[in-house]
Design a protein with these regions (language model features):
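A short loop-to-beta-strand scaffold at the N-terminal edge of the catalytic core in hydrolase folds
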Residues: 2-12
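Hydrophobic beta-strand anchors of alpha/beta hydrolase catalytic cores
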Residues: 22-24, 49, 139, 161, ...
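Glycine-rich His-Gly loop
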Residues: 24-30, 114, 144, 166-167
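Conserved alpha/beta-hydrolase "acid-adjacent" motif
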Residues: 170-179
Length: 224
């Protein structure tokens, strides 16, 4: 059994109750520049943040100092699906916090964390791992991997979803997200996508926005 932890940060002068919060789900290599970037921005807007660490509590996700030895097995073993489960856990935990407004809990995720933020809205996954009666108020996946099709992945909750991707992202194909959004819109869902021109993966960070190797195909290794 894994124990996953997170850090709850309240903005300056936050109220004693009914504070909105955004759950932050990190990418493959853990909490880094992109996640810290959004933590600061969200807190500056008067919104609390809950930074989930999905790596350190998992046997195959414990990273060494140079991020090369074990971290790759985290993605290989879980393919980001653990972010979905962690997102549900964070939602349940925060909904019972005395200072948090349970109806204003949002989610933002980067890369593999964005997969969690995107697909935790799938009703089938919610039935498997979520808590009945609890949904996120909003979902913001940043450059998510949409290049895997799941059974009934067009049957989602009514949570508004806003996807952000770079036009030149070769790490995860942009077209797959555009097509997924079109499929969800055809179902009448509140989903939209923003494609930023001349930008790559992790485009919002100082060290990101660079060209990655192109992934030609993808095998998730497991069935969900």
């Amino acid at each position: 059994r894994n124990i996953i932890w997170g850090t709850l940060n309240f903005p300056d002068n936050a109220a004693d109750k009914n504070v909105p919060v955004v759950v932050i789900l990190h990418g493959m290599s853990g909490v880094h520049e992109a996640e810290e970037h959004w933590l600061k921005i969200i807190n500056s807007m008067g919104i609390a943040t809950f930074m989930v660490d999905s790596n350190w509590g998992r046997k195959k996700c414990k990273k060494d100092s140079n991020l090369k030895k074990d971290i790759k097995w985290c993605a290989a073993a879980n393919r980001g699906m653990n972010r979905i489960i962690d997102g549900y856990g964070a939602l349940e935990l925060l909904s019972n916090h005395p200072r948090i407004d349970p109806k204003r809990i949002g989610c933002i995720g980067m890369s593999l964390g964005a997969r969690g933020c995107l697909y935790l809205n799938v009703k089938r996954f919610k039935k498997m791992w979520g808590t009945p009666g609890l949904d996120f108020a909003a979902s913001v996946p940043m450059y998510p991997p949409c290049n895997v099709t799941y059974k009934e992945d067009d049957e989602i909750t009514d949570t508004p979803i806003r996807i952000h991707v770079g036009e030149l992202d070769t790490y995860f194909p942009v077209d797959s997200c555009v097509n997924y959004v079109a499929k969800l819109k055809a179902k009448g869902k509140d989903v939209d996508i923003k494609v930023y021109p001349d930008t790559h993966h992790s485009f919002e960070t100082k060290t990101g926005g660079k060209k990655f190797m192109k992934i030609r195909d993808h095998n998730d290794g497991r069935c969900y």
